[in-house]
């Protein structure tokens, strides 16, 4: 029987529920269990795909093309499994489906209500991911905070699920803040007491509590919380701020967090094998403390919020760890970058990366960054829009097409070297309609891309509407812009790079390789980019 673990949060949001859940997933997998993960988001958006990165951070894309919450990126990186669209759902998606079914007549004229219809639909999502993956353990994180009005149907659903699946197959973990009051020189337990009281008012008694704090929590504080919440003291854990999110599994393992979960669910506490994770942590510590610094300038549009580029930043650090280099990522506001200040801003960068994005704002600054990288022989990695930027800059400054651009930004430009995909013609809906998910890419032998991957055919995830305009392909290639990867039929250009006699390492891809990088297995493009930047 599949075991279900539900992770809720209390007091405030952004506590680290996702990291706690992902760490548990890693620990259970290290004990030999098949683990999958899921995020339930109570907001009314159907998915995060159209949400502003300033509000929600990056949109993570799964292999099967779902635009998901960034926590799925944490899940994939920690448990090293590819998740699917079944691993993330929202209130908006639940209601959209229910209303469509009601309009279709599926409820035979019955009154459609939150209980049982909404809660049943939510529980069907729990069962669905279990059936799809055949996992031993499903870990579901409930977004938001206990007490939020929009989250109440989800809380009711996880309460009911204990009866549906059997009490022995369900575990409730509550992550709560224990704030430190500087004036009093002590941590306060009252917020957690009230949070658990709120949770219990919905009929859920937590089995395990995880206390989040930026200060050390003494055993007497744990005992106090255990007493007030009716939770065994050995099931009250502390998760203090760590040097890195990747240190959290080790911190929790030292407290036997996963052992208590196994005991609660009747799972055989198999021996834990964390050798690969410990090896990664040792390499990371060595790279950060003793490795040569490698400064990467990430030129973007949403640089005020690093989470907007979370997977890119993590992929750079994975590569640095693998190579024994201390990667320093500097976020550069593309909107503020110009010919007048580019030397001052990018002059000390070992490498320049232009990530994905949408809209014209900051486009000119990204063009400036690509030009600087090309002219000054600075290693360059372009991702999605970053590839389009590289193509536009080359067409402008090498071919001499001063107005070369993307039809996304200038529909009337004479030289649209980046144009709308044929399949996007006539598409008016914004949500979930782009070219999404994994597509094959055939690499050209002898190119930097082919050497990085070491394979002739690779799969990468995509999220875009616009593509390289092949009408300019011959002209661009003649001038030195090599097409190094295409769709298997050769129709779509997926990767480009500068000829080696023009630049030592200048590679750009229409895909989002950052989504497939793992702590113990860095993505080859990021690995070779950092290697080139370190030389």
Question: Model regions: which residues?
Answer:
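Short low-complexity, flexible loop/linker segments enriched in glycine and/or proline
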Residues: 50-53, 224, 395-398, 499-501
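Cysteine-nucleophile active-site neighborhood
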Residues: 18, 22-26, 30, 345-440, ...
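Active-site proximal loops enriched in glycine and acidic residues that flank catalytic Cys/His/Asp
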Residues: 9, 39, 213, 240, ...
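Flexible phosphate-sensing "switch/lid" loops adjacent to ATP/NTP-binding sites
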Residues: 1-328, 335-351, 358-359, 366-372, ...
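Short acidic-aromatic active-site loops that bind/stabilize oxyanions
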Residues: 108-119, 302, 356-363, 434, ...
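A generic structural signal for well-ordered coil/turn residues at beta-strand boundaries
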Residues: 1, 205, 232, 292, ...
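C-terminal and late-domain segments of enzyme folds
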Residues: 436-440, 444-535
């Amino acid at each position: 029987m599949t075991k279900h673990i539900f992770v809720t949060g209390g007091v405030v949001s952004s506590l680290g529920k996702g990291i706690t859940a992902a760490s548990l997933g890693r620990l259970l997998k290290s004990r030999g269990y098949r683990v999958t993960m899921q995020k339930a988001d109570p907001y009314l958006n159907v998915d995060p795909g159209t949400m502003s990165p300033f509000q929600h951070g990056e949109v993570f894309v799964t292999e099967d093309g779902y635009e998901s919450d960034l926590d799925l990126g944490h899940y994939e990186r920690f448990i090293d499994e590819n998740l699917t669209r079944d691993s993330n759902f929202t209130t908006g998606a639940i209601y959209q489906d229910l209303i469509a079914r009601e309009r279709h007549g599926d409820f035979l004229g019955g009154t459609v209500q939150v209980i049982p219809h909404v809660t049943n639909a939510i529980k069907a999502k729990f069962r669905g991911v279990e059936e799809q993956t055949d996992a031993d353990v499903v870990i579901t994180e409930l977004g938001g905070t206990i007490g939020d009005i929009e989250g109440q149907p989800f809380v009711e659903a996880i309460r009911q699920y204990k009866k549906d699946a059997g009490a022995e197959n369900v575990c409730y973990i509550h992550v709560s803040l224990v704030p430190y009051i500087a004036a009093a020189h002590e941590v306060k337990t009252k917020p957690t007491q009230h949070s658990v009281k709120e949770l219990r008012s919905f009929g859920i008694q937590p089995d395990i509590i995880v206390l989040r704090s930026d200060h050390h929590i003494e055993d007497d504080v744990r005992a106090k919380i255990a007493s007030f919440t009716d939770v065994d003291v050995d099931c009250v854990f502390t998760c203090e701020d760590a040097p890195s999110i990747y240190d959290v599994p080790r911190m929790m393992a030292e407290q036997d967090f996963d052992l208590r979960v196994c005991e609660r669910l009747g799972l055989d506490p198999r021996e834990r094998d964390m050798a690969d994770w410990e090896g990664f942590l040792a390499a990371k510590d060595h790279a950060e403390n003793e490795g040569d610094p490698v400064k990467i300038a990430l030129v973007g549009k949403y640089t005020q919020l690093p989470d907007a580029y979370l997977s890119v930043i993590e992929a750079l650090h994975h590569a640095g760890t693998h190579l024994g280099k201390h990667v320093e990522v500097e976020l550069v506001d593309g909107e503020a970058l110009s010919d007048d200040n580019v030397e001052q801003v990018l002059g000390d960068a070992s490498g320049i990366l232009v990530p994905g994005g949408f809209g014209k704002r900051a486009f000119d600054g990204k063009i400036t960054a690509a030009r600087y990288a090309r002219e000054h022989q600075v290693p360059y990695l372009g991702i999605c829009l970053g590839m389009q930027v590289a193509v536009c800059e080359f067409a402008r400054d090498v071919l001499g097409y001063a107005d070369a651009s993307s039809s996304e930004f200038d529909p009337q430009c004479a030289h649209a070297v980046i144009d709308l995909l044929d399949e996007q013609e006539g598409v008016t809906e914004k949500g979930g309609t782009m070219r999404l998910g994994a597509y094959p890419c055939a690499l050209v032998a002898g190119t930097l891309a082919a050497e990085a991957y070491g394979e002739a055919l690779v799969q990468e995830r995509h999220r875009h509407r616009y593509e390289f305009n092949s009408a300019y392909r011959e002209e661009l290639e003649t001038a030195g812009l090599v097409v190094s990867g295409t769709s298997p039929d050769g129709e779509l250009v997926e990767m480009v790079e500068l000829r080696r006699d023009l630049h030592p390492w200048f590679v750009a891809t229409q895909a989002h390789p950052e989504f497939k990088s793992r702590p113990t297995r860095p993505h080859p493009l990021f690995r070779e980019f950092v290697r080139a930047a370190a030389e």
